[in-house]
Amino acid sequence: MGQETNMLNAHQQLVRTSSGRPGHDKRQQTPGTATGLLKLLSSTPYAEQRSLGSGDGVIHAQKQRSRSAGQTPKKDRRLRGRNKKGQSSAEAEDVVPSSPRKPSFPFQWAWESFTTDGRALHQPSSVLAPGHQALPLPLAVHHHKSRRKSTPALPEAHSFCWKTEEPNLERRQQLRACSCTSIPPGRGTSQELEPSGEGGLQSPRKSSGSGLEPEESEPEGLGAEEAERGLIPGELPQLPRRGLILEEEQFSEATEEAEDGEHRAPWRRRTSSRRKGRNSGEEAWEESEVRRLESVSSSTNLREPQRRKPRAKELEGPWDLEKLQRKLQQELDCGPEKQPWKSLRAAVQASNWSRKAHPLGDDETFLFANFPNRTFHKRQEATRNLLRAWELQQREEQQQAEVRRAREQRVQHQVARCLAAYAPRGSRGPGAAQRKLEELRRQERQRFVEYQAELQGIQHRVQARPYLFQQAMQANARLNVTRRFSQVLSALGLDEEQLLAKAGKRDMEGAPRRHRSHRSVGARMEPSSQSPPKMEPTGSQADQHFAPNPDQELSP
């Protein structure tokens, strides 16, 4: 058992050194690592060593290598899977040393040989070329390798292709068989995959120490890798296209997730059985909490109908604006030395507390006072906003009253100044304004009497001349007749002035009357009120005087 533990530790050390230092070649590793590899090779049974040349043996070795590489982190394996295209060319040649790659899934090399190099399936043989090995091997080494002659690569490649498509049932059965060994509790996650490694490392044979064993392991590992990939040692693999790379990465990720789930399934079963003991106490505590919360909720449901009634009363009390206004008026009437709003706020809060304390118990009132909830804060904020609005309204009313009083005083001062301007200089006593007012009233009465007298005179004049329109029509008719007479005289070639002079000699009184008839229309439209009846005889005399004159002139 101690020897198996030593071999297992050596196997873990080999995996860690190969995954931690990918830049070094296997030939440049420390002798301890080579010794560990030799122990691993020597620990395999003889039946497996005989079957190394066939495809099944290579697949079994590939499974062992994939299990050992399964301990590496998943992130590092994905990064190496993405960068594995640039590192896979120079491993087959001994001239250019390169780092060995760790497979990201069990059949990675077979998948690469199938996708990248199509010639691997159609070549007649991909046997290792004799004499191409870099280091000459002794007779013992050749004798040891003669037992393991490799078969042609064509059936190996076909077996790889068919093995990649078979389901994971065989791998699951192997992992379940390997995980039957007991895992001691308290070990880290890096040791979860150790039973699967132990199942493949158990063998009845023991390693025989010889000086040629470190040299044998290196070419043998290279030959196995070349046989697995199905490549000729002299040629380099071709890089696949981008679509093939993406398909390969997706397939590798799916295979890795399936492997991780299979490896962790037994450990999860054990951890779930261990957690059951812990969860039992937690479930009991949660059940007690649920019962307590249900009891509290039932008690609150019983108290809810008791709380709804006082809430309705609360909305009637503190929000009644009339009561608040009456309280405010009482505080204002008490005097300006008090602060009414502070006392009103205290009274409202006291009324709220008294109403809440009546329906609720003393304990709940104490809790409510010590632990105010969100509703309490909202109610307080609403009360403060209401009182603030009332204060603002009262201030506005006070300001308006002050402005109104100031306006009244200003108007009174203006009236006093106007009265003082009309008052005599000698009268500056207290009765001067009254005397000035009486004087103004007397003057107003006098002006009213004069206006009434003027209106009466106008009324008398209108009533004394009821035919004024007829008189105006008669004056217009006389003017038209005179104009027509002048036109007739001018048409006959008679001089109106000479004719009027001759007529005036006969009647001296008719000349001034005839001269008045030649006045303007405006002068005749303004008859004097003193002698209205003189107009008619004047017109009649003029007509009588003008009528015979043309007859007398035209008769000879």
Swiss-Prot record:
Residues 387-463 form a coiled coil. One of its GO terms (cellular component) is photoreceptor connecting cilium. Residues 75-85, 266-278 have a biased composition (Basic residues). Residues 1-102, 180-320, 503-556 are annotated as: Disordered. Residues 304-320 have a biased composition (Basic and acidic residues). Keywords: Coiled coil. GO terms for biological process: cilium organization. This is Testis-specific protein 10-interacting protein. It comes from Bos taurus.
